[in-house]
Amino acid sequence: MLEEAYLDLAKTVLTTGHEKTDRTGTGTISLFGYQMRFNLQEGFPLLTTKKVPFGLIKSELLWFLRGDTNIRFLLQHHNHIWDEWAFQRYVDSPEYHGPDMTDFGRRSLVDADFNQRYQAEKKAFCDRIVTDQAFGDHFGDLGLVYGSQWRAWQGHQGETIDQLANVIETLRTHPDSRRMIVSAWNPADVPSMALPPCHTLFQFYVNDGKLSCQLYQRSADIFLGVPFNIASYALLTSLIAKEVGLEVGDFVHTLGDAHIYSNHVEQIKTQLARTPHAAPQLWLNPDKSSIFDYEMSDIKVTGYDPEPAIKAPVAV
């Protein structure tokens, strides 16, 4: 099964990982240095041992591809996975005059009354991002995060570098190049980012008419984040392969700090007790030629028959 690589990762970290503290204060079981490989010829690696919301993966990747850094696009597509980081910037600003939201990530998990206030404040914030242009332009922006680095890296001479477009052109003209790399980790810009990039750098490789991609991910939330990352980069590889006339090869996922949060352990044990199903297939609109032209309706998975979703809190 295509999914076994992920399940093996989870088992390995549970059994051999080290207990560590972390930035969020949640605590983790962590392992440093791990690699998974997914043969994309065998299907699309969207996990089946729990339902993974593919619509959120699609809209986030399209957001990256647009070079966008404002959550308004995500909210318009009912995607809330970046809300907490934008909201954090707002409540830390002098413009916020609502209830005390200090340490809202942890307090919302242990205090039901606070969680009710927090959810109401966050919903009002997200609604205003969409409806109030000036407010949304300011507080919806996450800084120079993924989309900006992929599509508009700022060079030393003030030039703008579209790393992704450059890689696609190199795939067409010099497919054996070892320089087909896109980096989201820009040390000069990290302080301005709401969340420094977890998936930091990816590289493409062509062999026998197939396109493979390797991702280096510095920080890997195994239960919540990694399933998204696997599917997102498999989708990106598939989109680019289609554009340049190649078949898909492997997605290689290299992890730095691979961790399971302490409040995800029971959930991941539940997932590991389940039996994987057959991998779904990816459908891409044959009428689209550029990865920058896709809309939500142009990307679908077929034959997806997952086990039920398993909820878990996000560590902010």
UniProtKB/Swiss-Prot annotation:
Active site positions: 198
Among CDD domains, the record links this protein to: TS_Pyrimidine_HMase
SUPFAM superfamilies assigned to the protein according to its UniProt record, in alphabetical order? Thymidylate synthase/dCMP hydroxymethylase (SSF55831)
- Please tell me which top-level EC class this enzyme sits in: transferase
Q: Where in the cell is it found?
A: Cytoplasm
Task: Output the Gene Ontology cellular-component terms.
Answer: cytosol
EC nos: 2.1.1.45
Q: Which reactions appear under catalytic activity for this entry? A: dUMP + (6R)-5,10-methylene-5,6,7,8-tetrahydrofolate = 7,8-dihydrofolate + dTMP
Pathway annotation from the record: Pyrimidine metabolism; dTTP biosynthesis
- Which positions in this protein are listed as binding dUMP? 23, 178-179, 218-221, 229, 259-261
BP terms from Gene Ontology: dTMP biosynthetic process; dTTP biosynthetic process; methylation
Membrane-spanning ranges: none
Q: Does the keyword Transferase apply?
A: yes
Q: Which Pfam families match?
A: Thymidylat_synt (PF00303)
The alphabetical list of record keywords is:
Cytoplasm, Methyltransferase, Nucleotide biosynthesis, Transferase
**Could you give a GO molecular-function term held by this entry?**
thymidylate synthase activity
Q: Which residues bind (6R)-5,10-methylene-5,6,7,8-tetrahydrofolate?
A: 221, 315
Subunit info? Homodimer.
Protein function:
Catalyzes the reductive methylation of 2'-deoxyuridine-5'-monophosphate (dUMP) to 2'-deoxythymidine-5'-monophosphate (dTMP) while utilizing 5,10-methylenetetrahydrofolate (mTHF) as the methyl donor and reductant in the reaction, yielding dihydrofolate (DHF) as a by-product. This enzymatic reaction provides an intracellular de novo source of dTMP, an essential precursor for DNA biosynthesis.
Its family remark reads: Belongs to the thymidylate synthase family. Bacterial-type ThyA subfamily.
* PANTHER family in the cross-refs: THYMIDYLATE SYNTHASE, THYMIDYLATE SYNTHASE 1
Q: Which HAMAP family match?
A: Thymidy_synth_bact (MF_00008)
Protein's name in the database: Thymidylate synthase
